[in-house]
């Protein structure tokens, strides 16, 4: 230990005992000066350092508190957003289900309407066919009747002579006269 103190003594110059001052030469200072300086720094710096640390601690605590409040607000907003998302998903699912059921309903209505229209068209077709058949039958009947009438007239004209014709007319007039007397 003596070697260590001798090395410090040889490195620096000792101030005289009558004066007080700070030796700024680090190598020339002794342990007492260093301890005095450290003691003064600790004594006076303790308050400043503790104020700085307290301020820093308060800022950190305030920052943490603000962060917690922001976190709570963010969690609350997240829950609201999730709730809205669930609601929107539920509504979307409902719209999808309703849309599909509406589509199915419209599809069935369209199919039923188409069947009814086809049935009406089939009825109109059948009525038209029956009408055309009846018209054709009537035309055929009319032609047959006209041909039969022509044939009968031809036969009558060829078979009847004037005398037979006059007798038939007289007989018919006589029958009409008898019918008139019966009705009177």
Swiss-Prot record:
The lineage of its organism: Eukaryota, Viridiplantae, Streptophyta, Embryophyta, Tracheophyta. GO terms for cellular component: chloroplast thylakoid membrane; proton-transporting ATP synthase complex. GO terms for molecular function: ATP binding; proton-transporting ATP synthase activity, rotational mechanism. It holds the Pfam family ATP-synt_B. This is ATP synthase subunit b, chloroplastic. In plastids the F-type ATPase is also known as CF(1)CF(0). The gene is atpF. Disulfide bonds: none annotated. Belongs to the ATPase B chain family. It is a single-pass membrane protein. F(1)F(0) ATP synthase produces ATP from ADP in the presence of a proton or sodium gradient. F-type ATPases consist of two structural domains, F(1) containing the extramembraneous catalytic core and F(0) containing the membrane proton channel, linked together by a central stalk and a peripheral stalk. During catalysis, ATP synthesis in the catalytic domain of F(1) is coupled via a rotary mechanism of the central stalk subunits to proton translocation. It is found in: Plastid, Chloroplast thylakoid membrane. Keywords: ATP synthesis, ATP-binding, CF(0), Chloroplast, Hydrogen ion transport, Ion transport, Membrane, Nucleotide-binding, Plastid, Thylakoid, Transmembrane, Transmembrane helix, Transport. Coiled coil: none annotated. The chain crosses the membrane at residues 27-49. The keyword Nucleotide-binding applies. It comes from Nicotiana tabacum (Common tobacco). F-type ATPases have 2 components, F(1) - the catalytic core - and F(0) - the membrane proton channel. F(1) has five subunits: alpha(3), beta(3), gamma(1), delta(1), epsilon(1). F(0) has four main subunits: a(1), b(1), b'(1) and c(10-14). The alpha and beta chains form an alternating ring which encloses part of the gamma chain. F(1) is attached to F(0) by a central stalk formed by the gamma and epsilon chains, while a peripheral stalk is formed by the delta, b and b' chains. Its main location: plastid.
């Amino acid at each position: 230990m003596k070697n260590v103190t001798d090395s410090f003594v040889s490195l620096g110059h000792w101030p005289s005992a009558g004066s007080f001052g700070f030796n700024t030469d680090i190598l020339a200072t002794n342990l007492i000066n260093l301890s005095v300086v450290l003691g003064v720094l600790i004594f006076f710096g303790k308050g400043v350092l503790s104020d700085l640390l307290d301020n820093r601690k308060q800022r950190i605590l305030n920052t943490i508190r603000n962060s917690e409040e922001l976190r709570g607000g963010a969690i609350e907003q997240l829950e609201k957003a999730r709730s809205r998302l669930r609601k929107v998903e539920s509504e979307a699912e409902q719209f999808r289900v309703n849309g599909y059921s509406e589509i199915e309903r419209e599809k069935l209505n369209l199919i039923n309407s188409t069947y009814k229209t086809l049935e009406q068209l089939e009825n109109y077709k059948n009525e038209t066919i029956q009408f055309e058949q009846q018209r054709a039958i009537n035309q055929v009947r009319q032609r047959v009747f006209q041909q039969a009438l022509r044939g009968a007239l031809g036969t009558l004209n060829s078979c009847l002579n004037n005398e037979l014709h006059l007798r038939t007319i007289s007989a018919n007039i006589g029958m009409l006269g008898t019918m008139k007397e019966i009705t009177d």
